[in-house]
């Protein structure tokens, strides 16, 4: 089964908790704090593997969780950092944040790596909080929670040339005779239901990859037929071979076919029309094909401005192999002078997949539940909250000072909070003291 989209969840490892410990040894009076830091949580890393061809591995395994770091230890020893979880993906995988739709990365090179979820840093042990005023602190931090996100994966096959056209115009036959690929061929619509890939070698020794894509029909850009399921694969191609059945064996007008397919390409992604097209007039061994070709050329010229350059037209027969060598040489020549096309605008890409907080991000938000409990929320606040060790009084007091420094007490008071009101942060409830 060919699978080219998948939605998965990834969870990086939490940082290990810092430790509260004190040095207690004979002949070492006033040993002081000795608790070490927790280890870093493991990242979730995507690694490109050229041996993979589909996203099939993600059909049943949709959850990926990295290990957490070890806790800090006595003698000031740090906990061990967790190993990264490395997930193999095929070449041509685009990774999006499922919530925002932003493109995180486009993985196209073998061995390329990208961190899709960052592990949390280890919490600090009490040795880190020693000061002249507090030489024996009973303060430690919990490890930072690892990043958790839902991802949308899209596989767009890597090919230099894409074959497009209506069903049964001869795309699969053409691919089978110009490459060693063995696509499924039949005298019925949608014989090809997955993209097929083959390598072409011209008489002059040049080579390039060709993809035979499932046939398009009118409305494909809106999902009709196989629709957008396979239109995405055209995006990576640099040259489009537009295959047209000049025999009109299906009862359609070849020129109307040409217009209809271009309309679908344009509707799906305007940039597809920036790619150079070669018109391949196929089935020229059939009766009336030559007459239809002359009519096609006439209509094409009528709809082009006199200063516009007409697309190149190559009459061929996939069955008899007539005209194939000339077509392949011209395709190779066009590829040599055609650059790669950007798949995404910069606005579609995250500048950096970084797990952290924006300087201008609001520290917290205040709301009120139906039971009159004040609720404090916000990513920055929850990070501090989750890293607080509430088993230690000094850690609790430290969090209270941080919350006050962020303006929490003042903001609650401004919203009308009174002495004795309940305040909820996460699953914990506190009493507001004015």
Curated annotation (Swiss-Prot):
GO molecular function: GTP binding; GTPase activity; magnesium ion binding
Compartments it resides in: Cytoplasm
Enzyme Commission designation: 3.6.5.-
GO CC terms in record: cytoplasm
Record keyword Hydrolase present: yes
UniProt xrefs under InterPro entries: G_OBG, GTP-bd, GTP-bd_Obg/CgtA, GTP-bd_prot_GTP1/OBG_C_sf, GTP1-OBG_CS, GTP1_OBG_dom, GTP1_OBG_dom_sf, OBG_GTPase
Listed cofactors: Mg(2+)
Domain OBG-type G: 159-336
PROSITE patterns in UniProt: G_OBG, GTP1_OBG, OBG, OCT
Highest taxon in the source lineage: Bacteria
Every Obg domain range: 1-158
Record's keyword terms, sorted: Cytoplasm, GTP-binding, Hydrolase, Magnesium, Metal-binding, Nucleotide-binding
Binding site for GTP: 165-172, 190-194, 212-215, 282-285, 317-319
Domain OCT: 356-434
Subunit (UniProt): Monomer.
Family the entry assigns: Belongs to the TRAFAC class OBG-HflX-like GTPase superfamily. OBG GTPase family.
Protein name as annotated: GTPase Obg
Organism classification: Bacteria, Bacillati, Bacillota, Bacilli, Lactobacillales
